[in-house]
Amino acid sequence: IDFHFPIITNSTVAFFEKEGVGYAWETNFVQLAVPFRVEDIVEFAKENEFENLIAVDATASDELISHYNTLIQNGFNIVAVNKKANTLPIGLYKEIRENLKKYDKEFLYETSVDTGFPVLQTLRDLYNSGEKITKIRGVFSDNLSYVFNRFSSDETAFSAVLKDASLLGFMRSTFRED
């Protein structure tokens, strides 16, 4: 498979590959990236007649999710590790699903728990093989697992457990993103 990445963005700037620019994307991104809007991405893809478009959302942000419909309507498939993408208000979720069907596009997503165990595809595979899943239980967060296990086994103040978890790098800015 020959993957080509003509557009690379972060939350504020984008690198749009131009004729004659080599494939040193990291250097090009630092030197040539410019502020952008999602409409700029769509326009660039159309002007260059790119095929098999895929927008990859590797963020934990709501910002790109709010543009999924625009991307889908303009020929992009969506691949996301963004955990928020499937927890949208039901109206937006349904609109995305309707557009995926209408424009014959795909929305592929996965998330992992703890040390990287892929949850969604594993559950999908079990279900598709005929297994009846009746219950899923557990603490599926390395952060919360550490906090709960430590707090339940030690005579340590909860605030101290949180502080230690933060010092060890287990804390995210919000547990909802875990």
Predicted regions mapped to residue ranges:
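A general structural motif
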Residues: 51-52, 75, 104, 133
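Hydrophobic/aromatic residues located in beta-strands of well-ordered beta-sheets
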Residues: 5-6, 78, 107
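Core active-site phosphate/anionic-ligand binding loop and the adjoining beta-turn-alpha structural block
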Residues: 91, 104-178
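Glycine-enriched alpha-helix->loop->beta-strand junction motifs that scaffold or abut catalytic
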Residues: 74-78, 142
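N-terminal glycine-/serine-/threonine-rich beta1-alpha1-beta2 phosphate-ribose binding loop
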Residues: 1-74
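Glycine-rich phosphate-binding loop of nucleotide-binding enzymes
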Residues: 58, 80-81
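Rossmann-fold NAD(P)-binding glycine/threonine-rich loop
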Residues: 61-74, 83-126
